[in-house]
Amino acid sequence: PANDYLLKKFFRIPLDENVSRSRINAILFYYTAWYADNGGEVTEANDYDAVGIWSLPGQHLPATLSDDPKFNKIFFDDLDKRKYEVLPPSMGYYYLFMIGKDLSQPNVRGSVRTILNHYKERADRDNCAVVLEAISEHAKSVYEYFGFRICLTFKFGEKEVNSQGILDPEGEGFTGHLMIYHKDGEKVLRL
């Protein structure tokens, strides 16, 4: 639900507009191509069982602002501010825009691990960080397992949707976590 909410916001689609799974998939394909066209990397593991969309140190794509100032403040102003408070000056970082696993193949395991480990190894070699936002508690626990540290916990979608993404003017929205990995995180990240 949180991913669909975010895609609607990024594409300026009203939250009350019906959006089919085909249209959500088209938005995902658009972002995949946009990242690939603009110097990002699209990586896969286990014959596309998992796919990750990344930007590279010094080559981050411009923000795709929504038409919602409150959302933009959270996702672009607040998260960027905290990221730069935590990272040492001039430290580069890999940014995980999105990662997905083919849930129709539950017997295929280790795909997300393969992708995350590849970028952690690159970051270690380059003395860079890896930055991402976990938009579910499950994702947060997976990233913590891989050594990511929570830098900021934030709410989004409050008073717009409930935790299932259903419109609700009193809804609690979603909880996200800005997370950063660095091989020497205990020493260099300013948490």
Locations of regions flagged by a protein language model:
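Active-site rim helix/loop that mediates acceptor-substrate recognition in acyltransferases
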Residues: 14-41, 53-55
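Helix-loop element at the rim of GNAT/NAT acetyltransferase active sites that forms part
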Residues: 1-18
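Glycine-rich acyl-CoA binding loop
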Residues: 107-119, 123
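Conserved beta-strand-loop-alpha-helix junction that forms the acyl-donor binding cleft
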Residues: 97-104, 131-140
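Conserved acyl-donor/pantetheine-binding loop and adjacent beta-alpha core of acyl/acetyltransferases
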Residues: 34-107, 122, 155-172, 185-191
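Conserved active-site alpha-helix within GNAT-family acetyltransferase domains
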Residues: 122-127, 136-160
